[in-house]
Curated annotation (Swiss-Prot):
PROSITE patterns: PGLYCERATE_KINASE. HAMAP family: Phosphoglyc_kinase (MF_00145). Belongs to the phosphoglycerate kinase family. This is Phosphoglycerate kinase. One of its GO terms (cellular component) is cytosol. Gene3D superfamilies: Phosphoglycerate kinase, N-terminal domain (3.40.50.1260). Pfam families: PGK (PF00162). Monomer. Pathway: Carbohydrate degradation; glycolysis; pyruvate from D-glyceraldehyde 3-phosphate: step 2/5.
Length: 416
């Protein structure tokens, strides 16, 4: 599959040309609407800056959160526009709508090197519609914002696994290119799937087994070891017959976990100890117990020091490491030790030459929250769900469409 890149578009020339960019600017906000982790905004800058420096008239589409019933002031991209402007070093206009009169007027008024951010694309229900016609109608209106002669750049890796109007459908209408972020993510994930140096260690955390089931089953036949931590480890411990107290538990997944343990017992690695407490609170005192001796009135919020030591020893010998999901409730300092310990072990292995990939989402947020240098890892992905689905071998709509011939061309590259 040949995917045209941003470099191809820049070589064609973008001066005076309208370019629609789908970025992933879905950053976390606190209760006051202040951005708490601008990592995704930072990751979007290289592609946008290259286009703006080339004289393009850039229109950015992005989402924030999951609006339920149309526009929600709490999910406006206003704080994102301000933060993006600071990082780009230029003013970022924010449209008052998506494809309405304000967006149209602002898009028409753009001059070379200007950038316009559309309001939260998910305020328009057609963006995430299951109806192909509804999505295509929105995509046509988005394409009009950069017409005539416009182009589309896909740079939101965190959404490429979604068949949505601004991710998939618009690429069927405009000449389409992979932005630097998306191209880099594809390169790294291809390396993980096709040219993996052994031993290959996978570290999976997070709360739910159901979210990671596909990637566990896919990677269990490819990896030398899969470390299980986070809230999901308690369902695995329950599958071994252990009591897990009041810990997070997916009862409906116990039989599945038992099957996985039976089938991949030589690959899966579970904690030998955990850190428990009586209530889910940052100030609730921690207690380390064996994984098979969790008191009935306590819940596990982190893996224990013995587990960290074992997992770190395993990781120290790895040549390839993929990590997705924290080992505990890292937002609570008393329960961040497991996540920090695993992160530091991966950093140490990377320093010895291992190829390490942090699979986006909460694990990437944990790296930043714990003050660990992002440059200490080989790659930090911006897409948790997209990374997992790619490694499962699923077709990602937002990637597949980029491999199609440009509008008006045949498979061979000539005119239709």
């Amino acid at each position: 599959m040949t995917i045209h890149s941003l470099e191809d578009l820049l070589a064609e020339g973008v001066s005076g040309r309208g370019v629609l960019v789908r970025s992933d600017l879905n950053v976390p906000l606190d209760e006051n609407g202040v951005i708490t982790d601008a990592g995704r905004i930072t990751a979007s800058v290289p592609t946008l800056k290259a286009l703006l420096d080339g004289g393009a008239k850039v229109v950015v589409a992005a989402h924030l959160g999951r609006p339920k019933d149309g526009p929600d002031p709490k999910l406006s991209l206003e704080p994102v526009a301000a933060a993006l402007g600071e990082q780009l070093g230029r003013h970022v206009q924010l449209a008052g709508d998506i494809v309405g009169t304000d967006a149209l007027a602002r898009a028409e008024g753009l001059t070379d090197g200007d950038v316009l951010l559309l309001e939260n694309i998910r305020f328009d229900k057609r963006e995430t519609s299951k109806d192909d016609g509804e999505r295509l109608a929105l995509a046509k209106q988005l394409a009009e914002l950069v017409s005539p002669g416009g182009a589309f750049v896909s740079d939101g890796f965190g959404v490429v696994h979604r068949k949505q109007a601004s991710v998939y459908d618009v690429a069927t209408l405009l000449p389409h290119y992979a932005g630097r972020l998306v191209a880099d993510e594809i390169r790294v994930l291809e390396q993980l799937t096709s040219s993996t140096e052994r031993p290959y260690a996978v570290v999976l955390g997070g709360s739910k087994v159901s979210d990671k089931l596909g990637v566990i089953e896919s990677l269990a036949t490819k990896a030398d070891s899969i470390v299980i931590g986070g809230g999901m480890c308690f369902t695995f411990l329950a599958a071994q017959g252990y009591s897990v107290g009041t810990s997070l538990l997916e009862k409906e997944m116990i039989d599945t976990c038992r099957r996985l343990l039976d089938t991949y017992h030589d690959v899966l690695r579970l904690p030998v100890d955990v850190v428990v407490t009586e209530k889910f609170a940052a100030d609730s005192p921690p207690q380390t117990v064996a994984a098979d001796a969790i008191p009935a009135d306590t819940m596990g919020l982190d893996i224990g020091p013995g587990s960290v030591k074992r997992f770190a020893a395993l990781l120290s010998n790895a040549k390839t490491i993929f990590w997705n999901g924290p080992m505990g409730v890292f937002e609570f300092p008393a329960y961040a030790t497991g996540t920090r310990g695993i992160a530091e072990a991966i950093v140490a292995a990377t320093g010895k030459g291992a190829f390490s990939v942090v699979g986006g989402g909460d694990s990437a947020a944990a790296v930043r929250a714990l003050g660990i240098s992002e440059g200490s890892f080989s790659h930090i992905s911006t897409g948790g769900g997209a990374s997992l689905e790619y490694l499962e071998g699923k077709t990602l709509p937002g990637i597949e469409v980029l491999g199609r011939p440009q509008p008006g061309q045949t498979e061979g590259g000539g005119p239709a």
